[in-house]
């Protein structure tokens, strides 16, 4: 919805349980076209399952939106649980950004912001210049961060996608 997931959709069964989501790549829907929480029918007739840099995904799946809307069940997780929630929208609890963090996007280029949790486990937040919060300053404090959990070359990354996702790190 905020532009950070350009041509990516997170498809979940909305139970909030582990291992119930997957990324669908190559679809160019906007929040207006396909609002978060829209129940969909997915045709796999032309779809291809793919693993790209460790991230399981579907390519060329056909999405048929319905008129039915649901309230998303968002799992609250720790960094140690990230591997069970790849492809799902989650909230990661108690993250602290690195002391040198400035804004979500630096120099108008996709940016990784490093975080750690209470156990000092790392989590990377990836943000593209398309995100509505790209130029927002990051407060150096402990808070929760929401977004789509992904994996890239063995490391877990969260893609926040709205101002609400990053609200805990707003500079007051």
Question: What positions do the PLM features span?
Answer:
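OB-fold nucleic-acid-binding modules
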Residues: 1-172
